[in-house]
């Protein structure tokens, strides 16, 4: 009887230790995974967010970086703006 109880108790003890350490490591990994996913998401959105230049600011004609309107080249300087045309009746 004693001979069969010792292995059973030992196995129950080892299983309990495994369950405790598995829960502990899952909590640790879950926290670091959340943290790293936030970093990845932030870098993803920063790549998607296109920085634009407000109206009247310097711009690059080849880059199309104006928030509104187009990049207009006026007197050797490129600025963001909206080109208005006059229509005569």
UniProtKB/Swiss-Prot annotation:
Principal subcellular localization: secreted
Localization, UniProt: Secreted
UniProt keyword terms in alphabetical order: Disulfide bond, Knottin, Secreted, Signal, Toxin
InterPro entries for the chain: Conotoxin (IPR004214)
A molecular function GO annotation: toxin activity
Pfam families per UniProt: Conotoxin
Tissue-by-tissue expression: Expressed by the venom duct.
Segment forming the signal sequence: 1-22
Proregion residues excised on maturation: 23-50
GO cellular component, one term: extracellular region
Disulfide cysteine pairs (residue numbers): 52-67, 59-71, 66-80
Family: Belongs to the conotoxin O1 superfamily.
Domain comment quoted from the record: The presence of a 'disulfide through disulfide knot' structurally defines this protein as a knottin.
Protein name, as recorded: Conotoxin Lt6.4
Organism, scientific name: Conus litteratus (Lettered cone)
